[in-house]
Swiss-Prot record:
One of its GO terms (cellular component) is cytoplasm. Residues 20-30 have a biased composition (Low complexity). Residues 1-11 have a biased composition (Polar residues). One of its GO terms (biological process) is negative regulation of DNA methylation-dependent heterochromatin formation. Catalytically inactive regulatory factor of DNA methyltransferases that can either promote or inhibit DNA methylation depending on the context. Essential for the function of DNMT3A and DNMT3B: activates DNMT3A and DNMT3B by binding to their catalytic domain. Acts by accelerating the binding of DNA and S-adenosyl-L-methionine (AdoMet) to the methyltransferases and dissociates from the complex after DNA binding to the methyltransferases. Recognizes unmethylated histone H3 lysine 4 (H3K4me0) and induces de novo DNA methylation by recruitment or activation of DNMT3. InterPro entries: ADD, DNMT3_ADD_GATA1-like, DNMT3_ADD_PHD, SAM-dependent_MTases_sf. This is DNA (cytosine-5)-methyltransferase 3-like.
Amino acid sequence: MGSRETPSSCSKTHETLNLETPESSSTDPDSPLEEQWPKSAPDLKEEDSMDMVLEDSKEPLTPSSPPTGREVIRYEVNVNQRNIEDICLCCGSLQVYAQHPLFEGGICAPCKDKFLETLFLYDEDGHQSYCTICCSGHTLFICESPDCTRCYCFECVDILVGPGTSERINAMACWVCFLCLPFSRSGLLQRRKKWRHQLKAFHDREGASPVEIYKTVSAWKRQPVRVLSLFGNIDKELKSLGFLESSSGSEGGTLKYVEDVTNVVRREVEKWGPFDLVYGSTQPLGYSCDRCPGWYMFQFHRILQYARPRQDSQQPFFWIFVDNLLLTEDDQETTVRFLQTEAVTLQDVRGRVLQNAMRVWSNIPGLKSKHADLTPKEEQSLQTQVRTRSKLAAQKVDSLVKYCLLPLREYFKYFSQNSLPL
């Protein structure tokens, strides 16, 4: 079984360990198709079978000795018969602010803020950085369903599913998580009906960002992404994430790259499309250009209007504009006004040394959680560095751009065999 610290690959042939309990032996008849285990889920063939853990957490508890910490969750539910919706799943607090969007149970105000902050954060391996349930945890179990990016901490599975569950999972060859299982209940952990709808509603209602997120897409409904890339070609970044296949004639995503959009009109963009993602950027630092930096933003905004789907469309549509630290303060204020969202500053720090940074305007979820302002001294240092950089650097995969695109794995098909580390 793979974890964040000890990744492993799935065995092609092994005996599936079935730990079903009577209460979890059937799927939820009221769940919509997208939340049920599909009749033929992609990549989960018989020869790639995966282990399941469906424990019963109702082991004996001593009423005279109430536990401390998160252990109080099982005590309150099993001994005091408290409704789990009145307990924070993340920390065990009884000061519930709202309902947890993914699983039955409450969530307190501090944990709600942490949940929203970490929801779309990813590590270099392409999986989410924090536990799907409590948004913490140092060592995490990685769901090994090919199309899932979620992780779970040892504490959550032992407390909410049952003591010793983490050891059972760790001993398995492959493990699929509680949002991928065909059964909705594992111990105290009850997956919510229509949890993707619940997650979107929770984010839109409680999140600080004025930009609404799209409902995440079930793995078997995801389609290859169609990208319009302006001024800068992100072909390498998309391929390294698995969104584009390297071989020609494949069923992977598509990329339309346009360097000069001066004479591009709406009819041409509509003919090229439709698109799921529009990318644009100012020129990289150190490159000479006849255009002023503000020109790139205005042209990006113009083409973006041509590429947008109809207002009544439910299609997830994303856009991202990257400023390579060229826009003036006035330009940045104008960009905020036109794109109707604040900028996020992302830094590439390696070994405590600032390697690169950029400002990003986008509706891709999760980017604000990595916002880190640059000091004037840091920005000046980057400006100085680019004078000595080789233009060959532009041929490398941009790790900051890759980081921005990682959340799109929740919406579009990607090909795991093509994925490379950041």
